[in-house]
Amino acid sequence: MLPMITGFMNYGQQTLRAARYIGQGFMITLSHTNRLPVTIQYPYEKLITSERFRGRIHFEFDKCIACEVCVRVCPIDLPVVDWKLETNIRKKRLLNYSIDFGICIFCGNCVEYCPTNCLSMTEEYEFSTYDRHELNYNQIALGRLPMSVIDDYTIRTILNSPQTKNEVNPLI
């Protein structure tokens, strides 16, 4: 009879402990109801990227001296630089410059080490395509400046996201 009573007592204690754990979890769930939603409706709403965001590379053809530093510092030797040596002026003349964004890892080394600052990172990150060969950008495609997310009137930018709140109030 005694083991049966202690078994019921253990069962009662385990039931109370389980109810307490369920109550703690439910209180955490209820505490999240006052928070703002984190998700956004992507095609219609976009977050504003930070100024250090590494998006598509912008290339200025006139500034490039065909030194190939970008190719040497790239971990995957990605930029393709075609040039011709002009013997009468003893300088390289750039013929073609291209980057395949299907392979690019967006490390930013090419932008950081470029001596003439002809490469820069933009805030463009939409590379959706059905054909991977469309991700190979030549100097003409790299030279186009993308439309800023802030200037695009067709979408709504989200200013009160948790990321921007932390940047504005770093002490909170």
From Swiss-Prot:
A GO CC annotation given for this chain: chloroplast thylakoid membrane
Any GO molecular function: 4 iron, 4 sulfur cluster binding
Compartment(s): Plastid, Chloroplast thylakoid membrane
Enzyme Commission number(s): 7.1.1.-
Chemical reaction(s) catalysed: a plastoquinone + NADH + (n+1) H(+)(in) = a plastoquinol + NAD(+) + n H(+)(out); a plastoquinone + NADPH + (n+1) H(+)(in) = a plastoquinol + NADP(+) + n H(+)(out)
One BP term from GO: photosynthesis, light reaction
Record protein name field: NAD(P)H-quinone oxidoreductase subunit I, chloroplastic
